[in-house]
Each structure stands twice: as C-alpha cells, then as structure tokens.
C-alpha cells in the first residue's frame, strides 16, 4: 500500500527530461526538484547497480576497468520508476531507478574521484585493453 507522503516524493524524483547525447556520451537528466545532471556513460557503467558490478554485499564490488569509451546503445524503460541502459560492452543488467540516478548526480564528483583513486591503487586503466 502506498503511503500518502510517498506520492509527492516520487513525483520529485521522476525526471522531467531524459536525453542521450551520443557524441559527448552523456545522459542528461532534469528532475522536478530543480536539479539537473549530465552523467557520462563511463560513470554510469562503472557505477551500475547490477550485482555483476556491486556484488552481493559490502566489499564484493568489482572494479570496472577499460570503460572510458563505452557507449549506450539502447535504453529500455522499467515500469515508471527506472531505465535499463544497454552498454556497448554488452552490459545490460543494471536497473537504474530514478532515485539511484538522482543520487549518482548529487554525488557525482565524490563518486568519480573515488573511482579514479581505486583505479590508481589497482594500477588499472580506464582505456580498453
């Protein structure tokens, strides 16, 4: 059963604009709370909410390497609450809820720096092998 207070919150987190920019490889989102984000495809790919990337619990995350030039070839809606992008490397199991995309946008700078730090610590590259 939906609570009375859930509806306004859900509406705020539903994007009013979703655009794929293939040339710059950026997903552009605007939300009803006034926030707008430009999320690079690589960023979305390395922070996929799938079990393949996140693991099944804390400490099981899999560092995603070689994703610098990844593109999104298709985006499928998932109900009225999410999208499922299909990436050029074949990854298609991440379901990105509006809430998750909003969270990625608000934390983008911090999350990106964390990713770069993990890559450096692992001696890994963003470039494809």
Summary of predicted features, one role per range:
Residues 2-129:
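Motif-centric detector for short Cys/His coordination patterns
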């Amino acid at each position: 059963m939906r609570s009375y207070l859930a509806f306004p919150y859900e509406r705020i987190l539903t994007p009013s604009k979703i655009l794929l920019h293939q040339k710059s490889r950026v997903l552009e989102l605007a939300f009803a709370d006034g926030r707008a984000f430009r999320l690079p495809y690589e960023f979305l790919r390395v922070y996929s909410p799938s079990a393949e990337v996140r693991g099944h619990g804390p400490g099981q995350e899999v560092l995603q390497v070689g994703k610098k030039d990844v593109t999104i070839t298709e985006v499928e809606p998932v109900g009225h609450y999410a999208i499922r992008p299909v990436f050029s490397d074949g990854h298609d199991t991440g379901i990105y809820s509006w809430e998750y995309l909003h969270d990625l946008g608000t934390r983008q700078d911090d999350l990106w720096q964390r990713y770069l730090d993990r890559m450096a610590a692992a001696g890994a590259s963003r470039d494809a092998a």
